[in-house]
Amino acid sequence: MLAFIQGELAEVKENYVVVDNNGMGYEIFIPHTVHSYLPAIGDKVKFHTYLQVREDGMALFGFLNREDLAMFKLLITVNGIGPKGAIGILSAISTDDLRFAVLAEDVKAISKAPGIGTKTASKLILELKDKFKLEDAFEATFQSNQVISTGGKGNNDGIREEAIQALVALGYSATDALKAVKAVEITSNMTSEDVLKFSLRNF
């Protein structure tokens, strides 16, 4: 219904902002992580939005990019997690880190979000883990470095998986291992040992 709202940033509070669009002020709930990316009061801003409609009223939830909105929509499909719970999760952990945590089945990382215990975190992982693939976590890396090995993306995925497993065996958490390996730019002649070596430099 409301795909996005664009206008002047009129007010900023801890949990929400007010956007002035043609004389109408829209109250939009946002993750805390958005605050550091907001423009100055009076400047133009655009939020990709989700409209919650309930018997007792409506509420708008907004994000600065479509990726965060997409993750929010996935989170509210999990039984027991509503829009405000999803906002709380995305206030505590970024979309990228949340994707890594789900792939790594890292209950501890997800349960750091306010109001999310280990039981809910486990349920979230169970219901969303099939929504992501390892290549999703590395998609930004593929797009940014434009390095394609002779074996293709699939071969790189195999090398990455071996490096991740090695890091976990060394005692690093699965989430930290995923993030460290993601930061490595892989070229066609690299082995999993090379990726492991460069990944260790990211700790």
UniProtKB/Swiss-Prot annotation:
Principal location:
cytoplasm
Q: Which GO terms describe its molecular function?
A: ATP binding; four-way junction DNA binding; four-way junction helicase activity
Query: Where is this protein found?
Result: Cytoplasm
Cellular component terms, GO, for this chain's entry?
A: cytoplasm; Holliday junction helicase complex; Holliday junction resolvase complex
Q: Where is this region: Domain III?
A: 155-203
Q: Where is this region: Flexible linker?
A: 144-154
Region spans: Domain II: 65-143
Question: Which InterPro entries does this UniProt record tie to the protein?
Answer: DNA_helicase_Holl-junc_RuvA_I, Hlx-hairpin-Hlx_DNA-bd_motif, NA-bd_OB-fold, RuvA, RuvA_2-like, RuvA_C, RuvA_C_sf
UniProtKB keywords:
Cytoplasm, DNA damage, DNA recombination, DNA repair, DNA-binding
The UniProt record lists the keyword DNA repair: yes
Q: Residue ranges of region Domain I?
A: 1-64
Tell me, which GO biological process terms does this entry list? DNA recombination; DNA repair
- According to the record, the signal peptide region is none
Domain description from the entry?
A: Has three domains with a flexible linker between the domains II and III and assumes an 'L' shape. Domain III is highly mobile and contacts RuvB.
> Which family is annotated?
Belongs to the RuvA family.
According to the record's subunit comment, the protein's assembly and interactions are: Homotetramer. Forms an RuvA(8)-RuvB(12)-Holliday junction (HJ) complex. HJ DNA is sandwiched between 2 RuvA tetramers; dsDNA enters through RuvA and exits via RuvB. An RuvB hexamer assembles on each DNA strand where it exits the tetramer. Each RuvB hexamer is contacted by two RuvA subunits (via domain III) on 2 adjacent RuvB subunits; this complex drives branch migration. In the full resolvosome a probable DNA-RuvA(4)-RuvB(12)-RuvC(2) complex forms which resolves the HJ.
Cited function:
The RuvA-RuvB-RuvC complex processes Holliday junction (HJ) DNA during genetic recombination and DNA repair, while the RuvA-RuvB complex plays an important role in the rescue of blocked DNA replication forks via replication fork reversal (RFR). RuvA specifically binds to HJ cruciform DNA, conferring on it an open structure. The RuvB hexamer acts as an ATP-dependent pump, pulling dsDNA into and through the RuvAB complex. HJ branch migration allows RuvC to scan DNA until it finds its consensus sequence, where it cleaves and resolves the cruciform DNA.
Name of the protein? Holliday junction branch migration complex subunit RuvA
